[in-house]
């Protein structure tokens, strides 16, 4: 911001608490108090994976993520963005936009804005990088092709709601000019070997080249997924961060929901997150 087939019954039993946690997180922003912390959660067990080496684990979950990315291109969904600035505990401005998202036969994304209110954000304005975060990084899927640009380091195992997960640190190998990357952590479900949670930010932050050019500071976000037709699709992301602009700071909260997934051919409507 500037200035394979899965048994549905088992799915329901297995992800019930995880989905409940997502639903609880989607209450109005005034009820969200803790700032985003990628280190929060249960005890991190640094024991190596038992059934395979770390390298094999990485290869397998990247292959699954590649399938998720390909599958998601065959769905339409709604992207609902709410950004708020706060003065103490009081909301003093917001930006709200709802967009219908679809993809053509070549995987090219098409956006149709169905609701957009006049922004009243205080102390900040939405930048192109903010919209990149919403479109690309909050619902980020780490495919085999993308992984060539990153160093993935095994961090351990952690219980997330009712799921057992493997945790990886993800850092770009290099930062090429005019390109943006994800930096943070991903949580990989130990059974399905797909990402179920991620936390981090997009990098690099834009360097101010001119004296009067506004600073662009990237907030830390956390994103969650839910099983949609057998794949873990992005459904929710949030930001609760205090952004520092020189000597000034702005408290920002953000909720992004990706919901109403349905197949593009209309043959089957997926359950809403």
Identify what each model region corresponds to:
Residues 1-13:
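N-terminal secretory signal peptides that target proteins for export/translocation
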Residues 186-188:
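Non-globular disordered terminal and juxtamembrane segments underlying protein topogenesis/assembly
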Residues 35-182, 191-196, 201-219, 226-235, ...:
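Structured extracytoplasmic
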Residues 7, 24, 35:
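Extended interaction regions within the primary functional domain
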């Amino acid at each position: 911001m500037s200035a394979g087939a899965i048994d549905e019954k088992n799915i329901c039993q297995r992800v019930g608490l995880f989905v409940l946690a997502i639903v609880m997180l989607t209450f109005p922003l005034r009820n969200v108090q803790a700032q985003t912390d990628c280190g929060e959660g249960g005890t991190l067990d640094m024991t190596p994976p038992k059934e395979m080496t770390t390298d094999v684990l990485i290869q397998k979950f990247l292959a699954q993520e590649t399938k998720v990315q390909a599958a998601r291109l065959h769905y339409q969904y709604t992207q609902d963005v709410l950004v708020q600035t706060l003065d103490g505990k009081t909301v003093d401005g917001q930006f709200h936009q709802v967009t219908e998202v679809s993809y053509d036969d070549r995987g090219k994304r098409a956006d149709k804005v169905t609701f957009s209110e006049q922004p009243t954000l205080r102390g900040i304005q939405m930048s192109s990088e903010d919209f990149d975060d919403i479109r690309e990084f909050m619902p980020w899927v780490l495919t085999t092709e993308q992984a060539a640009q990153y160093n993935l380091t095994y961090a351990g195992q952690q219980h997330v709601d009712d799921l057992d997960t493997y945790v990886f640190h993800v850092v770009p190998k290099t930062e090429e000019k005019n390109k943006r990357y994800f930096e943070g952590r991903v949580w990989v479900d130990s059974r399905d070997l797909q990402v179920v949670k991620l936390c981090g930010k997009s990098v690099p932050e834009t360097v101010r080249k001119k004296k009067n050019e506004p600073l662009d500071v990237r907030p830390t976000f956390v994103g969650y997924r839910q099983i949609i037709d057998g794949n873990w699709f992005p459904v929710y992301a949030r930001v609760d961060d205090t952004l520092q602009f020189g000597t000034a700071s702005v408290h920002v909260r953000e909720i992004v929901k990706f919901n109403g997934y349905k197949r593009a051919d209309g043959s089957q409507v997926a359950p809403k997150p």
